[in-house]
Amino acid sequence: MAKKSMINRELKREKMVAKYAEKRAKLKAIIGDVNASDEERMEAILELQSLPRNSSPVRLRNRCGVTGRPHGYFRKFGLSRNILRERVMQGDVPGVRKASW
């Protein structure tokens, strides 16, 4: 089980990413626009740099929905490998079987 503080920190980052997503997209569009003047671009770059670091989606980390474990995460299920294995063995995940060859 991950520390509660780490799980809460990640939730805080998710909220911040959602809050600034539209603003970041607009600024990135200006920066990538070839028709924009150099002054507009520099202004957009400086404004983008002034946004909080945690508003960047790159800083998000996928965590297990049950334990908060950051490694061994399966996106399809939203669980870490350990919990996924337990759930599959109990039959809680439909359509998944243990491999045998």
Curated annotation (Swiss-Prot):
A single cellular component GO annotation: small ribosomal subunit
Keyword rRNA-binding in record: yes
Keywords tagged on the record: Ribonucleoprotein, Ribosomal protein, RNA-binding, rRNA-binding
One Gene Ontology biological process: translation
A Pfam cross-reference name: Ribosomal_S14
Keyword RNA-binding: yes
Cysteine pairings via disulfide bonds: none
Gene Ontology MF annotations: rRNA binding; structural constituent of ribosome
Function: Binds 16S rRNA, required for the assembly of 30S particles and may also be responsible for determining the conformation of the 16S rRNA at the A site.
UniProt subunit comment: Part of the 30S ribosomal subunit. Contacts proteins S3 and S10.
Similarity remark: Belongs to the universal ribosomal protein uS14 family.
Protein name: Small ribosomal subunit protein uS14
Organism of this sequence: Psychrobacter sp. (strain PRwf-1)
Gene this chain is encoded by: rpsN
